[in-house]
């Protein structure tokens, strides 16, 4: 504070009585009075540490942890200040946030403060994230929400064609019998009852076996004949020449070409038909059209 001028009354706010400064008093007395007032005002102001404020980092983090946020923040800040060796009045510490020191106040939240997290060893931080013992919530452990076990997909069973129970086994013809049957089929594809009975007895076969063999052989001959006809049709089909550069020419020789050109040039013959404009075919002129605009000298 600045010293007051001589001859001015100053009302002391501390003691509540006026202090007159006369002409006989020197400037040293006025300076002493001002110094006393400043000391008293400074002593009346409480000293509050910025770490104990409700908007500090410790207080904000403690508010999200437990309902006793202010008490836990005060305890964490007191522990940090005691470790650093900072002195602070007891009355200010207990009355700044309206909390009293009691043995029942919770103090384990110091580990969740910024200073506690920074001071923790790396093993403690890594251990919480290690997948050795994965912790699950109770609703995840219930079988209702657990994933179903993987099912092994078995290959589908191959369904075979079922034959009749009274199906006769296939007759194993010998080479001599097959040659005789082929020779007889070339001679005659259909056998009468008497011919079939005589031929089957000569080959030591039954009439039914000879009859079925001739039926199968006729079906095979029909399939081969149809395949040969299809090949002949494909060979007899004329190969159409591809259109050169997309230009098709009418059939009939040069006369047909001239007739078509005249029809396109003069249009169809009729009393009310307008003459069509001649169109130059593409590719007939090798020089560019723009060259005809200039006169060569």
Swiss-Prot record:
GO terms for cellular component: nuclear periphery. Pfam families: Homeodomain. Interacts with CREBBP/CBP, TBP and SP1; interaction with these transcription activators may inhibit autoinactivation. Interacts (via C-terminus) with PIAS1 (via N-terminus). Interacts with H1-5. Belongs to the Msh homeobox family. Transmembrane segments: none annotated. Residues 166-225 bind DNA. SMART domains: HOX. There is a cross-link at residues 9, 127 (Glycyl lysine isopeptide (Lys-Gly) (interchain with G-Cter in SUMO)). Acts as a transcriptional repressor. Capable of transcription autoinactivation. Binds to the consensus sequence 5'-C/GTAAT-3' in downstream activin regulatory elements (DARE) in the gene promoter, thereby repressing the transcription of CGA/alpha-GSU and GNRHR. Represses transcription of myoblast differentiation factors. Binds to core enhancer regions in target gene promoters of myoblast differentiation factors with binding specificity facilitated by interaction with PIAS1. Keywords: Developmental protein, DNA-binding, Homeobox, Isopeptide bond, Nucleus, Repressor, Transcription, Transcription regulation, Ubl conjugation. This is Homeobox protein MSX-1. Residues 127-136 have a biased composition (Basic and acidic residues). It is found in: Nucleus. PANTHER family: HOMEOBOX PROTEIN MSX, HOMEOBOX PROTEIN MSX-1. The lineage of its organism: Eukaryota, Metazoa, Chordata, Craniata, Vertebrata. Residues 71-87 have a biased composition (Low complexity). GO terms for molecular function: DNA-binding transcription factor activity, RNA polymerase II-specific; RNA polymerase II transcription regulatory region sequence-specific DNA binding; transcription cis-regulatory region binding. Its main location: nucleus. Residues 68-114, 127-157 are annotated as: Disordered. GO terms for biological process: embryonic morphogenesis; inner ear development; negative regulation of gene expression; negative regulation of odontoblast differentiation; nose development; positive regulation of cell cycle; positive regulation of odontogenesis; regulation of odontogenesis. Sumoylated by PIAS1, desumoylated by SENP1. Sumoylation of Lys-9 and Lys-127 not required for interaction with H1-5, transcriptional repression, inhibition of myoblast differentiation, or binding to gene promoters.
